[in-house]
């Protein structure tokens, strides 16, 4: 017999990286919010790599921060090392990556949640949803407790019917040997959701005291203070290095000889694994021409000897893992502390979601994170933030928020999921974004702070600092456009010293900055600013001036795309009534139910001819008759 515990505006199921962002966002927006998790000791836990950021992912963390989310602030307080990646490349692919103290990260974020008004954290396993006439009204826990709510967000990670697999050993479990969520997965199927089976994996952890670091290459953090969050003013300078080593021919021989014992190759694993994070078995088989593969040794925290062996994700048996580790330079005498394993879990087919992350099947129910078929903490956190924002908006009677592909990598991520779906764990890459020159690490605050303020997640003090930064950027750009630099001897000398061509006549400072060999600091030496500018302002001025032409082209592409996005498609359109559509296109359109012609054009299997037919059909005004049938 169930018993009612209480009523909330928003209930979040799960307290991983998606759940934490969802719960915090909803509560901070003024919604009475409840977070339910299987184990309070696992809030914000990092079950796999102890890091945040990297290519594309680091930009997502910046976007989360610009919108008012927590991940950036939290990693800034708890990292052991931070590095800017791809500094030798263009600004579109630069990204920050932090090595986390995973235990400090977890403790700090749990503390933030516990201290947040409007937010209640409780240990309990949700087994089913309360659904009435296609509307989600709350949840029921294993203990029989009923919690009613205006909206519910599911962020269950890899817990849904989770199974850990290692060699021929297979048992029901969530990550890190936690209790899995089996009944909720079965309940979602009963409600009519299509589920898929995915797989991911993690490498072994080893004892730092047993590593011979003299045989490895040190990988230090950056000397320059770095941060993900716009709010961070105190920087951690006491950094801990990572270390680089490689597999050997002996490693590969051992793996080849034991492939039949790997769950990946014995048939034990049925789920689809991540393409961009393959197991060491996969790497050895698929890239058998490579004599070695990189292995990074990453400390898991400041107060532990556990080291994460990045690059060695595996489902081989324990004895093979131990032998394999000892074939790697520096690890000849290593002691393994935890085994690597593969984990299979259920995910929903994400084309069953609207761009708000609300499910199409059940109103007021949202999903975010690995349940939507993604991999990675950052992808989960970005979805969790948006799902929490939209669940709160619905509960408060406000308009929901959808980020476009031109607005953010988070927008690219969600649009890919709900429009194209995924047949493998989805990882965000810079190559997935058409407008990546617009979606840079350095301008996330300029793109999204206004959105965060409108939502109610950006405080006034921060907004004032942001507007001051924007003003300084514009004023400095105007200053450089108004100053003429003449070919004086000191000017010519500086230009010669950096390998440039001497001036023949006077030139605007902004035009001189457009030269590939010129940096803002060179211009500043010639025409210094009277106002002291931050490094972030200087960087923004240089990028906006130097890449102005390319940025303008991207903005023109965005405008063309927006014309297609502005052509709306009625939700209840009857695609069967459009006889000239190709059968594959008709089925895909019925499955996805796109909201605009732009979204329809991105569906796999819908070609330009189908789009033209659909466009003509809508413009002829037949929709009303179809809708009224």
UniProtKB/Swiss-Prot annotation:
Keywords: Cytoplasm, FAD, Flavoprotein, NAD, tRNA processing
GO biological process: tRNA methylation; tRNA wobble uridine modification
Cofactor(s) of this protein: FAD
SUPFAM superfamilies: FAD/NAD(P)-binding domain (SSF51905)
Positions of FAD binding: 14-19, 126, 181, 370
GO cellular-component term (any): cytosol
Top-rank taxon: Bacteria
Subunit structure: Homodimer. Heterotetramer of two MnmE and two MnmG subunits.
Role of this protein: NAD-binding protein involved in the addition of a carboxymethylaminomethyl (cmnm) group at the wobble position (U34) of certain tRNAs, forming tRNA-cmnm(5)s(2)U34.
Family to which the UniProt record says this protein belongs: Belongs to the MnmG family.
Protein name as it appears in the record: tRNA uridine 5-carboxymethylaminomethyl modification enzyme MnmG
Recorded name of the encoding gene: mnmG
């Amino acid at each position: 017999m169930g018993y009612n515990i209480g009523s909330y505006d928003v209930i979040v199921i799960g307290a991983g990286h998606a759940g934490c962002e969802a719960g915090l966002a909803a509560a901070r927006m003024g919604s009475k919010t409840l977070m339910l998790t299987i184990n309070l000791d696992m809030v914000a836990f990092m079950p796999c790599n102890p890091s945040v950021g990297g290519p594309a992912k680091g930009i997502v963390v910046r976007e989360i921060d610009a919108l008012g989310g927590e991940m950036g602030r939290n990693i800034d307080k708890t990292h052991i090392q931070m590095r800017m990646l791809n500094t030798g490349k263009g600004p579109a692919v630069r990204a920050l990556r932090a090595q986390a103290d995973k235990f400090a990260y977890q403790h700090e974020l749990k503390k933030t949640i516990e201290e947040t008004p409007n937010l209640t954290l409780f240990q309990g396993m949700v087994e089913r949803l309360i659904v009435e006439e296609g509307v989600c009204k709350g949840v029921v826990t294993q203990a029989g407790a009923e919690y009613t709510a205006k909206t519910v967000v599911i962020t269950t990670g890899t817990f849904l019917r989770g199974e850990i697999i290692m060699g021929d050993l297979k048992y029901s479990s969530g990550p890190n040997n936690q209790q899995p969520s089996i009944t909720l997965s079965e309940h979602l199927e009963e409600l009519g959701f299509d589920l898929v089976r995915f797989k991911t994996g993690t490498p072994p952890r080893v004892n730092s005291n047993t590593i011979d670091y003299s045989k490895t290459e040190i990988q230090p953090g950056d000397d320059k203070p770095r941060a993900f969050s716009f709010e961070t003013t105190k920087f951690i300078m006491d950094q801990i290095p990572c270390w680089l080593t490689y597999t050997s021919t002996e490693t590969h021989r051992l793996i080849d000889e034991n492939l039949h014992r790997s769950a990946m190759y014995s048939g034990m694993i049925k789920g689809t694994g991540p393409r961009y994070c393959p197991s060491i078995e996969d790497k050895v088989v698929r890239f058998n021409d490579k004599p070695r593969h990189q292995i990074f040794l990453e400390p898991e925290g400041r107060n532990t000897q556990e080291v994460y062996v990045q690059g060695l994700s595996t489902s081989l048996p324990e004895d093979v893992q131990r032998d394999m580790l000892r074939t790697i330079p520096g690890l000849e005498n290593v002691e393994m502390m935890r085994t690597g394993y593969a984990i299979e879990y259920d995910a929903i087919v994400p084309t069953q979601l609207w761009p708000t992350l609300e499910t199409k099947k059940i109103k007021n129910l949202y999903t975010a994170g690995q349940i939507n078929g993604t991999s990675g903490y950052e992808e989960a956190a970005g979805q969790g933030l948006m799902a929490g924002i939209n669940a709160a908006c619905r509960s408060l009677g406000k308009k929901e928020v959808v980020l476009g592909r031109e607005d953010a990598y988070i927008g690219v991520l969600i649009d890919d999921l709900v429009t194209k779906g995924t047949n493998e764990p989805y990882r965000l890459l810079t190559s997935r974004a058409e407008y990546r020159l617009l979606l840079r690490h350095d301008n996330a605050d300029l793109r999204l702070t206004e959105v965060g303020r409108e939502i109610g997640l950006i405080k006034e003090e921060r907004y004032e600092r942001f507007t001051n930064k924007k003003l300084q950027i514009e004023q400095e750009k105007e200053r450089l456009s108004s100053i003429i630099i003449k070919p004086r001897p000191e000017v010519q000398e500086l230009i010669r010293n950096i390998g440039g061509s001497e001036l023949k006549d006077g030139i605007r400072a902004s035009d001189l900055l457009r030269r590939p060999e010129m940096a803002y600091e060179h211009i500043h030496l010639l025409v210094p600013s009277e106002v002291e500018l931050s490094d972030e302002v200087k960087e923004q001025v240089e990028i906006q001036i130097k890449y102005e032409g390319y940025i303008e082209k991207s903005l023109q592409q965005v405008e063309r795309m927006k014309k297609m996005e502005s052509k709306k498609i009625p939700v209840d359109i009857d695609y069967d009534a459009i006889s000239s559509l190709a059968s594959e296109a008709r089925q895909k359109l019925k499955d996805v139910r796109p909201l605009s012609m732009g979204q329809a054009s991105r569906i796999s299997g819908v070609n330009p001819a189908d789009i033209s037919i659909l466009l003509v059909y809508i413009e002829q005004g037949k929709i009303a008759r179809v809708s009224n049938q």
